[in-house]
Curated annotation (Swiss-Prot):
GO BP annotations, alphabetical order: phosphocreatine biosynthetic process
Residue ranges occupied by any Phosphagen kinase N-terminal domain in the UniProt entry: 47-129
Start and end residues of each Phosphagen kinase C-terminal domain: 159-396
Binding site for ATP: 162-166, 226, 270, 321-325, 349-354, 364
Residue positions binding substrate: 102-106, 266, 312, 354
Protein's recorded name: Probable arginine kinase F46H5.3
Species of provenance: Caenorhabditis elegans
Keywords, in A-Z order: ATP-binding, Kinase, Nucleotide-binding, Transferase
Pfam families with a match to the protein in the record: ATP-gua_Ptrans, ATP-gua_PtransN
Catalytic activity: L-arginine + ATP = N(omega)-phospho-L-arginine + ADP + H(+)
Entry EC number(s): 2.7.3.3
Family, as annotated: Belongs to the ATP:guanido phosphotransferase family.
Top-rank EC class of the record's enzyme: transferase
InterPro entries (alphabetical): ATP-guanido_PTrfase, ATP-guanido_PTrfase_AS, ATP-guanido_PTrfase_cat, ATP-guanido_PTrfase_N, ATP-guanido_PTrfase_N_sf, Gln_synth/guanido_kin_cat_dom
Length: 396
């Protein structure tokens, strides 16, 4: 099969010099080779074993990868490969390169969650509040018909600057970043752009801005709006998630700048609803409308056990991150502030995203749980936690 495919594709490609066709050929050939049982190379196995040794020899490393990548797991998985050719090194390389990682692993494709489950399952159970290997993600419940219960958390505007709810989605039929070809990126971008162009709902309708060839004027405006995402940080770079940048990447936003979609950043799609103030119900209602509009035309990858599939296992399940930018000057100065948030199942970040610090006394606080609960429950976890923090701040 391999030789026949190679000969036919070579003859086809010989008729032209299309870079995209050659890229598609390269990816197809790689997949055929993987399916025909080609083993993981000795060089890759050596790098896997070196990575394991590096983690074990690093006392400053406290990642979940280090905790669950035992010698037994290495020996069990080091020679395994998904149908798309991804191996254990693809899973662990970011955590090996960045010893300060919290999680340290990424899934190069959907099959990785099954093939490398001796590593993923205990790690997922640890991160996602005891989500056991035999547990199943509940059916999707975005909160339709329930959003009116989420009244404004801060009607006087004393604490909350803005509210944001996002979810990630992966398109069916495509792997995750490390296994995507340039042709894949461009094809996905073309598909979702066509969907964006057909949105007629006045609350959602807007414009798509591709990163490739973006003018300085548009770039400056998107930076001013805090919409522009940059090429991946060192964690994503090390995971091989930024290939062919900026091909196939872009940003859609509605005319009111309250609904935003990132195309091929960390996940295939990041769907975001946001606005100033603390009206969580309004933000969620808009997100529901947006997700429903997109999924009618683009099927998403969902697993019966793990829910909506994403590149990073921290986002599995609902993929929902509901957050506020909030000022809590009194209680945030207390040494047990993080412990209080942990007890409320809340996660603290700086306002510039993951791995950033607080700025000007403003914190980005969100639900921590993504897996093992419904989408609405994830939002409600943030809502109830923030209400409690505001009450503590008022009483301090």
């Amino acid at each position: 099969m391999l030789h026949r495919c190679s000969r036919v594709l070579s003859q086809f490609l010989g008729r032209g010099n299309s870079k995209m066709l050659r890229e598609a050929y390269s990816t197809s050939l790689h997949c055929v080779q993987a399916q025909e049982g080609m083993s993981v190379s000795p060089d890759v196995i050596a790098k896997i074993e070196e990575g394991y040794a590096k983690l074990q020899a690093a006392p400053e490393c406290h990642s979940l990868l280090k905790k669950y990548l035992t010698k037994e797991v290495v020996d069990q998985l080091k020679d395994k490969k998904t149908k798309l050719g991804a191996n254990l090194l693809d899973v662990i390389q970011s955590g090996v390169a960045n010893l300060d990682s919290g999680v340290g692993v990424y899934a190069p494709d959907a099959e990785a969650y099954t093939l490398f489950k001796p590593l993923f399952d205990p790690l997922i159970q640890d991160y996602h509040n005891g989500f056991a290997p035999d547990a199943k993600q509940p059916n999707t419940d975005l909160g339709e018909g329930k959003t009116s219960a989420l009244v404004d958390l801060d009607p006087e505007g004393k604490f909350i600057n803005s509210t944001r709810i996002r979810c990630g989605r992966s398109l069916q039929g495509y792997p995750f970043n490390p296994c995507l070809s340039e042709a894949n990126y461009l094809e996905m971008e073309s598909k979702v752009k066509a969907i964006f162009d057909n949105i007629t709902d006045p609350e959602l309708a807007g414009k798509y801005f591709p990163l490739d060839g973006m003018t300085k004027e548009i770039q400056d405006q998107l930076i001013k709006d805090h919409f522009l995402f940059k090429e991946g940080d060192r964690f994503l770079q090390a995971a091989n998630a930024c290939r062919y940048w900026p091909k196939g990447r872009g940003i859609f936003h509605n005319n009111q700048k309250t609904f935003l979609i990132w195309c091929n950043e960390e996940d295939h799609l990041r769907i975001i609803s946001m606005q100033e103030g603390g009206n969580v119900g309004q933000v969620l209602e808009r997100l529901i409308k947006g997700v429903k509009t997109i999924e009618k035309q683009a099927p998403f990858s969902r697993d019966d056990r793990l829910g909506w599939l994403t590149f990073c296992p921290s986002n599995l399940g609902t993929t929902v991150r509901a957050s506020v930018h909030i000022r809590l000057p009194k209680i945030s100065a207390k040494p047990d502030f993080k412990s209080i948030c942990d007890g409320l199942k809340l996660q603290i970040r700086g306002i510039h995203g993951e791995h950033s610090e607080s700025e000007g006394g403003v914190y980005d606080i969100s639900n921590k749980a993504r897996l093992g609960l419904t989408e609405f429950e994830a939002v409600k976890q943030m809502y109830d936690g923030i209400a409690h923090l505001i009450a503590l701040e008022k009483a301090a």
